[in-house]
Amino acid sequence: KDSMTVFLEKLDEFNLNEYIHIIHFDELKVPSVPFQIPTSRTYWGISEVMESELDFLKATVLSKSTAPVIMYSDMPMKEMAKDPEFPKKWMFGMALMLKKGLHLYQIHNLDRSFDEMMLGLESWIPMYMTGQISPYYLKNTQSNPFLHLLKVSGSAALSGEAITGYHENGKYYLTKSKREVEYYHRRADELLKNADSLMEIYRSDREAELNTFLIADTRKSGKRRGIRSTLPLYTISEELLERILIRHGMDNRQ
């Protein structure tokens, strides 16, 4: 199977309620104990880079701020994924952030191989389904000699830099300084303004919005491409439709 087929199958099979039950999301308690880190700290090397990511999540979850979070990274994940505990801790921190009720604007880097991009999106599906994440992407990004990371919340900012191919020699900087957080927030806002929406997630509370969009869309000329988990109802033959209606005891009037 190609990566797109696998991605669509995962999307079709995903059940948010089942996922919430598996990770005990309903039972998660957002800690209220203040997280003590220096006003700012610099991190070096892969092991400290992983620590910086978790420290940012801790600082965000344990602060009183409920401001939205903006995240962008074109840093490779391969080295960090070698540590089996890091992805678990990172996902737990993300779950706590969503449990706190924070909204996340995730700017994806699509300058990756198609397979890697599909794999990345697959890992984000569970969090997308909460409706608290708005995914974006940057157009016209090209291979760059520099790697960057920028994550900003209402209470902390994490900035990272490295040379392509030498992630292990990069530097990450975490700050809680109000002035610096404001600076990084401006940068994140400007980056978000340059990004385009990757997808819209409609949950039950946005049903009216979805219906409005679908009705408006029917009035626009042009080609459509729909990817569905089963054939749409309008492809059914009249004979099969009649048999189904009769089986369910529905008369012509109904």
Descriptions of predicted regions:
Residues 84, 119, 150, 172-174, ...:
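Surface-exposed beta-strand edges and their flanking turn/coil or helix-capping segments
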Residues 91-95, 126-130, 180:
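Short, surface-exposed linear patches
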Residues 137-180:
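HKD (HxKxxxxD) catalytic microenvironment of the phospholipase D
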